């Protein structure tokens, strides 16, 4: 990877609204009659930011780390995905300078809770609120009222000499360690039996 002082990443995600599931956006549960369909919790904002962070250091995308259809990530908190992207960013020798996002959805209205959502995302990223921007637009005249979309751009700055990006074998080890943590939590909190480790199948298809 070129030893540039700054790099830019772009991320995009979209999900269809679905009845009977909670609406998760920006790490928050919003009061709305429908949620977003997805294998995980469908958090369109965190997914877009995650892909932007991974893209900034050319580390792949969500599907590279969390294979589509893997039952381990069914209804998973998208903060898990974001944390892994931050680890990749740190490994490459970079940190978040700022994040700019635009949500596109007909409802619910985001502006009344944008400040709270910014605070939540900033906390997840480990940055100040002045480094996170969350805007919202409506898809007027596009017949997309049944869909939520998010565009995210991140600027990252180098804080140390970049290390060599992880090999696929190292990525597998990271995923296994993460899965072990999830298994422990499920076992301790919900009494779910631990699952055997299986060799992950990598696919760039978006699982979310």
Question: Which ranges hold each PLM region?
Answer:
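Pyridoxal 5′-phosphate
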Residues: 134-135
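Short acidic capping loops at alpha-helix termini that bridge into adjacent secondary structure
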Residues: 128-131
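Nucleotide/phosphate-binding catalytic cleft detector across ATP-hydrolyzing
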Residues: 1, 178, 182-183, 187
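N-terminal and secondary-structure boundary signal
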Residues: 138, 142-145, 188-190, 196
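Cofactor-cradling patches in redox/metallo enzymes
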Residues: 164-180, 192-205
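RNase III-family endoribonuclease catalytic core
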Residues: 2-116, 120, 124-125
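C-terminal edge-of-domain segments
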Residues: 142-163
């Amino acid at each position: 990877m070129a030893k540039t002082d700054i790099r830019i990443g772009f991320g995009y995600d979209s999900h269809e609204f679905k009845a009977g599931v909670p609406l998760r956006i920006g790490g928050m549960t919003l009061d709305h009659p429908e949620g977003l369909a997805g294998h995980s919790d469908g958090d369109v904002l965190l997914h877009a930011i995650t892909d932007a962070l991974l893209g900034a250091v050319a580390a792949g995308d969500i599907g590279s780390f969390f294979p589509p259809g893997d039952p381990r990530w069914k209804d998973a908190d998208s903060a898990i995905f974001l944390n892994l992207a931050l680890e990749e960013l740190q490994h490459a020798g970079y940190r978040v300078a700022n994040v700019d996002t635009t949500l596109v959805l007909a409802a619910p209205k985001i502006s009344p809770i944008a400040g709270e959502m910014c605070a939540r995302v900033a906390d997840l990223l480990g940055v100040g609120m002045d480094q996170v921007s969350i805007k919202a637009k409506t898809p007027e005249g596009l017949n997309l009222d049944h869909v939520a979309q998010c565009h995210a751009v991140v600027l990252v700055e180098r804080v140390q000499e970049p290390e060599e990006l992880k090999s696929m074998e190292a990525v597998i080890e990271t995923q296994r360690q993460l899965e072990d943590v999830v298994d422990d939590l499920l076992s301790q909190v919900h009494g779910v039996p631990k699952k055997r480790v299986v060799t992950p199948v990598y696919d760039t298809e978006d699982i979310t």
